[in-house]
Amino acid sequence: MPVLFMPQMHFHVAAITEMSSKLMSAGQYENVSLYPNVKMSVLDGLFEKCDFYLDINHEGEIVDAVHRAFLNNMLIVGYEETMHNAYYTADTNIFKESEYADMADALNMTLAMPYLIDEALAMQKKAAVAADATDYREILHL
């Protein structure tokens, strides 16, 4: 389980339905908070609060989650096999499911060197060809 490789990261796992017993068992770890049958207001708060979005859910995407994570400037990291909207994810943040330890290493490195998150977010925006306020100012010559 990826949470074991990243004890310094807190994981918020939300579902709009009930969670499987396997997923519920992850609640035993101190760095995991589970939100089964999550209310939209709680989900909105998580999108605003969290810095990372792990696109590792084997089921269908809910609430346009990857796009919302992108709009909330969250670093999106996921498994190639479960990606829901790869358009918003930089290639360097996509791992094979069997490479979960590599994904954990990359996240741990980002946590250890916070400047890396800014670089990774810049690559993510570039991958999605996103514009920010500075880009618009340059276009408008402001």
Where are these regions (language model features)?
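A charged, aromatic-enriched C-terminal amphipathic alpha-helix characteristic of glycosyltransferases
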Residues: 98-101, 112-142
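Acidic donor-binding loop of glycosyltransferase active sites
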Residues: 48-61, 74
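Nucleotide-activated donor-binding/catalytic signature segment of Leloir-type glycosyltransferases, i.e.
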Residues: 20-38
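Conserved catalytic-core segment of nucleotide-activated headgroup transferases in glycan assembly
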Residues: 1-25
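Short alpha-helical segment that forms part of, or immediately flanks, the ligand-binding pocket
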Residues: 44, 63-71, 85
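Short acidic alpha-helix that forms the nucleotide-activated donor recognition element
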Residues: 39-51, 71
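Short glycine-rich donor-binding/catalytic loop of glycosyltransferases
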Residues: 58, 74, 78-88
